[in-house]
Amino acid sequence: MKFFALFIYRPVATILISLAITLCGILGFRLLPVAPLPQVDFPVIMVSASLPGASPETMASSVATPLERSLGRIAGVNEMTSSSSLGSTRIILEFNFDRDINGAARDVQAAINAAQSLLPSGMPSRPTYRKANPSDAPIMILTLTSDTYSQGELYDFASTQLAQTIAQIDGVGDVDVGGSSLPAVRVDLNPQALFNQGVSLDAVRTAISDANVRKPQGALEDSAHRWQVQTNDELKTAADYQPLIVHYQNGAAVRLGDVATVSDSVQDVRNAGMTNAKPAILLMIRKLPEANIIQTVDSIRARLPELQQTIPAAIDLQIAQDRSPTIRASLEEVEQTLVISVALVILVVFLFLRSGRATLIPAVAVPVSLIGTFAAMYLCGFSLNNLSLMALTIATGFVVDDAIVVLENISRHLEAGMKPLQAALQGSREVGFTVLSMSLSLVAVFLPLLLMGGLPGRLLREFAVTLSVAIGISLAVSLTLTPMMCGWLLKSGKPHQPTRNRGFGRLLVAVQGGYGKSLKWVLRHSRLTGLVVLGTIALSVWLYISIPKTFFPEQDTGVLMGGIQADQSISFQAMRGKLQDFMKIIREDPAVDNVTGFTGGSRVNSGMMFITLKPRDQRHETAQQVIDRLRKKLANEPGANLFLMAVQDIRVGGRQSNASYQYTLLSDDLSALREWEPKIRKALAALPELADVNSDQQDNGAEMDLVYDRDTMSRLGISVQDANNLLNNAFGQRQISTIYQPLNQYKVVMEVDPAYTQDVSALDKMFVINSEGKPIPLAYFAKWQPANAPLSVNHQGLSAASTISFNLPTGRSLSEASDAINRTMTQLGVPSSVRGSFAGTAQVFQQTMNAQVILILAAIATVYIVLGMLYESYVHPLTILSTLPSAGVGALLALEIFDAPFSLIALIGIMLLIGIVKKNAIMMVDFALEAQRTGNLAPEEAIFQACLLRFRPIMMTTLAALFGALPLVLSGGDGSELRQPLGITIVGGLVMSQLLTLYTTPVVYLFFDRLRLRFSRHSSQPVSE
């Protein structure tokens, strides 16, 4: 009593405390960063290494394996995958959440240094690493186009100046420049001219390398002066190299221009980038794992005007893609939903109380509680994101509950004629324990979420803490500010205030009367009601088992990613044409705003596209509907497939794939993996639960298999090294020298002119100069025949791996797909030497599925423990928890009706329902126990009176929570995919629970009371506490 009096009789102090909470919240709100979701990115580091011309198998065995053995010893590595293709190896290290990425980067560098001695000596540079996940969609894509500058010049400008500047911006993890390569002097050799002049390819390479030397020359010095020695030992341009003497034939000089075409070109001619089907250089910007996407994008945009000033007028720099507008629009939508929820909740209170003064009290309590939460969010390092703002939206119904319970009880005493201050003291004292029980038991629901590990735990932690803080502040406000405002604002009324019998009040009285009559009938037929309770338990279990499940709702972020996979023997020229054709088809779609893409490099038969859709208010279709429409249009393109997927704010794993979900096959026997992967992929592609099934195992690339006749080579004076150098010089785009410039270093690249390598007859023109100086054609000592070879070799850990990627058809869930895959693997009889497991998001889904039931049971057990401690009883918590099955039935039925799978967001809704619906039972049980103690009423009469007396606050709190969640169900626009499952779950659970628990709770209460009496030896008092 003294506690409540302290605040009721000191209104100024109470108001100032509330103002202080509000001001702190406003300050925290202004300082909070903005993000789509809580920070849940795994620390990922990518290691890259190159050896131009080396086959995928060579890269895997000589580069990837030594690096993997060294990197695999680093502590905290969650997963290590690698992919080796023509001349390139990429290793992805995914670390545990608790691993600091900067410390991990130091360990990665140390591991690379340790493996350096085991790597091939011909590598043009040491392996490098980047602190970014290559599988993440870029947060921004910039394009450079020009009518006067070449693609190589644009690439040089982008790589040397723009990428360097952007990479220094806080939050930027990686700037990947694509669409071409650095400028280079290309030496395209004429094999016929070389043969006629008797010049070997190795002699040309040596001559070029020896002619371009950057070495210190020292200085001259006398007693008074010092002169730096400078020579023309460097060659910079194609014009400098063209007159270079590479050989003497019969005393006549053979110059490089006589046997080759020398040009200022690019390092790798097999690269292409486009924007809207036009040539372009792309700057794909990815953020650091721990960086905030909105802050990073804002920082980049702030630097763009400065960068624009450094760009020549003939170069056009444009933002082709920016992921932040849809994120901002989504947050604006949820903020509007929050405001609507607050307004609806206040409206509910007004309809029940029909008093402006009374309505003002919760209208003040709710904003104070919600705004004050922002201060705690800032101190906890949280952000304003979809989940934290949804937590505040749902909290609207919670925080008003406490104020409603206190306000309604004080109003009841005022209507009975009690003076305001006395009613405030008496009313708050009566329900103080009830409000405390409701709040503590509600917070207890979220304790298991706080202890949950992995990505789901990280994802839900902000939601749980934000909601718990809001409830805690609401508890303090409802026990301090609310009683004070009631005591000073409200007036005493007559015992039977006529306003209760007008309009909505008359309807409420009629409903309450009808409820009383029906409750008497239910109490007389308690066995039937007991069967209903048992039925809801069984039905909720069955619905949970049968409902389709997924990890996270599919979001419409307004950005699509597309992976092109063409025939494995396709040429670069044909692949570039496919990219352009796909772009034209997509660009014609009315929902598409911009398309960018690139192809080439080490994977000639693949490409990547990024598609920006128009804003939601300018298109009528969702991202998935656009994908379905484009899939039909793109299906007729011969020789290539384009796999589209909507970019999500959550993507797990470092694998780059052409679909949203992955299933990985592992084996220590490479031949077994290559035998079974096509069978498994074909079987999975036939499943109706899967779409866009594809694999990263590509074993049918065209290869020309050369077999040396070593005896003949020995007789002719030719070594295997000579023959291999010939092939590398001719076909490997071999980097044979370096040109040093002030801002960058460029390469001299040598290969046979592509005009002579259009078919296998190019091998007939190749020759080696033997030890006697005679040209020996390759055909004299080697035979060749076409064969198949892998385009890439993939590892996970140290095992050979193949990842099958898939999307979900419209109307299918991830649980259905997972079950179908497991069933298919069993039916195929895959041997134990080939192991299958889900990867990435699908793997996290499997882990979450196993933890969901445990999490729900842990929440129920925690609530039981808290309630048992509060009531000092083993029985009463069971009565209160009996309300949960009906809520579960309602929630799961609502998801089924709306055709929404059970996701992590729906799980949050179930957890919230555990906290919400038990409030009704707490109010009933609390008043019934008090009536038995103080009024000496029988249990039947006590629970009956409790139900009638608490009918109005129960209806108010339930409707307030329901209307607080209703805007989530009805919301559209950006981000509605996240909000709707939460709203559907809560509204469905509340409706069903309200219909049943008003009747089942009294029956369960009486059942346990009779059970207690039957086993109790002390029956002198009606209730033993």
Swiss-Prot record:
The record ties this protein, via InterPro entries, to: AcrB_DN_DC_subdom (IPR027463), Acrflvin-R (IPR001036), Multidrug-R_MdtC (IPR023931)
A GO molecular function held by the record? xenobiotic transmembrane transporter activity
Keywords (A to Z) from UniProt:
Cell inner membrane, Cell membrane, Membrane, Transmembrane, Transmembrane helix, Transport
Give the transmembrane ranges: 15-35, 333-353, 360-380, 387-407, 431-451, 469-489, 528-548, 851-871, 875-895, 897-917, 953-973, 984-1004
Nuclease recorded as keyword: no
Query: Topology with regard to the membrane?
Result: Multi-pass membrane protein
* Record text on subunit structure and interactions: Part of a tripartite efflux system composed of MdtA, MdtB and MdtC. MdtC forms a heteromultimer with MdtB.
Family assignment? Belongs to the resistance-nodulation-cell division (RND) (TC 2.A.6) family. MdtC subfamily.
- What protein am I looking at? Multidrug resistance protein MdtC
The protein's organism comes out as Klebsiella pneumoniae (strain 342)
